[in-house]
Regions:
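N-terminal ligand-binding lobe of clamshell/alpha-beta domains
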Residues: 1-311
Length: 311
């Protein structure tokens, strides 16, 4: 069985299901686990990823005015690989190559089938793993993953059950300029992690939030995890972040805690590491209750001191 993944989260799902040996091609953004980075790359971006967050945002908007997708698909390479299945998504044209591009390419690959993922909520992510496992003939692996999901989610819930009714207000930031806050599955994650959701609605795309609306929120916890940004990229935009959010107003009224998290690895990829992301969020929301997660994921997160300064 020959598999192509055009989405980082899909690649992680296939690896979790024990199918890494079947992978013959991936997208240009598939970087985990490291062993997939040597596989042929089937996509490239038309936007300029070297710009700051405002520049990337504007570059993507400009590309989408004039093109079907932000990404190019190497159709000739895809044909030469002769995959049996292509795993992609049809939810977000900014996240990966468009579904219509994949469909068009598959018309010339008569024996190739498309598995399309479309997660909006946590349950959709788990269902995508299960349905992919069943389609690819590894259903027990999918069931094994579902058991892991149930156990790890319940472990967080159980510890919170003995904690009382304290639920800090949690704001997650998905992009810095303009400010997007986490939507889709993030509100559910905040709820499970023992927090109150600020503004976002479960199952809905990440909304742009004005500074005026941010001033009204007064969050207890702010988790900054820009989509596709590793920690070093987010750190470069820390000064920009300070101009985008009313952090001084928040700090004057309450002791808001700020965290920077690797947004390339966590939260934004709807795959197996969403479980890791939930545990990170549990630590950020209740650090005294979940101290071990702070240690476990220390390489992927930074707790900022007051004044949004590095420790």
């Amino acid at each position: 069985m020959r598999l192509v993944s055009l989405l980082p989260s899909a690649t992680e799902i296939l690896v979790k299901l024990g199918l890494e040996k079947n992978l013959i091609g991936v997208s240009h953004e598939c970087d985990y686990p490291e062993t997939v980075q040597s596989l042929p790359r089937l996509t490239s971006t038309r936007a300029n990823p070297s710009l700051d967050s405002a520049g990337i945002h504007n570059s993507v908007l400009e590309v989408m005015k004039n093109a079907v997708s932000v990404y190019d698909l190497d159709v000739e390479l895809l044909k030469s690989l002769k995959p049996d299945f292509i795993v992609t998504q049809d939810l977000c044209d900014v996240c990966a190559v468009s579904f219509s591009q994949v469909e068009e390419a598959c018309r010339e690959l008569l024996d190739c089938k498309i598995i399309s993922l479309r997660p909006k909520r946590l349950g959709d992510i788990w269902d995508d793993v299960l349905s992919t496992a069943e389609t690819l003939g590894v259903k027990p692996k999918g069931q094994q993953f579902q058991q892991e999901v149930d156990e790890r989610v319940q472990a967080v819930r159980d510890r919170l059950a003995d904690w009382g009714n304290e639920r800090p207000k949690v704001l997650t930031i998905e992009w810095i300029d303009p400010i997007y806050i986490g939507g889709m599955w993030l509100p559910e994650m905040i709820d499970i992690a023992g927090g109150q959701v600020c503004l976002a609605e479960s199952g809905q795309p990440a909304p742009i939030i004005s500074r005026e609306d941010l001033e009204k929120i007064e969050p207890d916890v702010v988790v900054v995890k820009p989509c596709g940004y590793k920690l070093d990229q987010t750190l470069k935009e820390l000064d920009l972040l300070k101009t985008q959010i009313p952090w001084q107003d928040w700090g004057a009224r309450l002791s808001t805690r700020f965290y920077l998290v690797d947004g390339n690895s966590y939260f934004n990829r709807p795959g197996p590491r969403i479980l890791d992301s939930l545990e990170i969020l549990a630590h950020c929301t209740h650090p005294d209750l979940f101290p071990e997660f702070g240690e476990q994921y220390a390489s992927g997160m930074i707790s900022l001191q007051s004044g949004l300064e590095l420790p």
